[in-house]
Amino acid sequence: MRKIYTRYIFDIDYTLLCPNWTPGNEYLRQNLNLDKESLKKIYSYITEYEEKVSFLTPDGLVNYFNQKGIPMTKDILDGWLIKNQNMTMVYEGVRELLVALKGHNKQISVVSDWFKECQYKRLEKAGLLSYIDTFVFGDTALKPNKEAYEKALAYTPKEQCLFIGDNYQKDIEGPKAFGLDAVQVTDENRYYMYRKLRKEIWMN
């Protein structure tokens, strides 16, 4: 018997939206006077910081960058977040899936490990806000901490929720350890997976 879900929980980057880091990288290179190797380290430092805390703060991230020798300031971070608000490309099949979900009275949550200031605006510019019922951003809780998954439930029973994301640790292992069903999307299977989910919804 096919399982019926009432809430679908999505990661954002590489799941709903396809990020293009080039403009943001160029902004950082110019404002921080970084060479190519130092620029690459920015993202590994973000990952390191996320592993040390349960939620993001701008001051905390700025301080961590400075500890690592990156001359980040709050103003530069704010400018970077604004620059990245323009990453609004929606993956093929996403809109159709969200339309089908709402057409069948399903609840939709999004969970992201990045700042609300950036991610909410991206969803708005991409035209996806109206489909989403619950938002969990890195300012509130970070995956794979259980608080992130708990907030995404919005009191929906775990067995009625499906988590969908690209990162195996945060979007598959984390949700499953918390008691959620989860499916991984990749560049190879993303469109097929969204078609499959849409078909299952129509068959319920």
Ranges and model annotations:
Residues 1-8, 34, 72, 99-102, ...:
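Asp-based, Mg2+/Mn2+-dependent phosphohydrolase catalytic module
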Residues 59, 82-109, 146:
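Short, acidic loop-to-helix structural element flanking the phosphoryl-transfer center
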Residues 34-37, 47-82:
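A metal-dependent, Asp-based hydrolase signature
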Residues 20-23, 92, 96, 121, ...:
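Generic recognition of short, well-ordered alpha-helical segments
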Residues 1-44:
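Active-site neighborhood of HAD-like aspartate-dependent phosphohydrolases
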Residues 24-29, 77-84, 119:
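Hydrophobic alpha-helical core bundles mediating ligand binding, dimerization, or RNAP-core interactions
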Residues 48-49, 84-85, 110, 158-159:
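Short, contiguous strand/loop micro-motifs
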Residues 23-27, 60-64, 96, 100, ...:
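Alpha-helical elements of Rossmann-like donor-binding domains used by nucleotide-donor carbohydrate transfer enzymes
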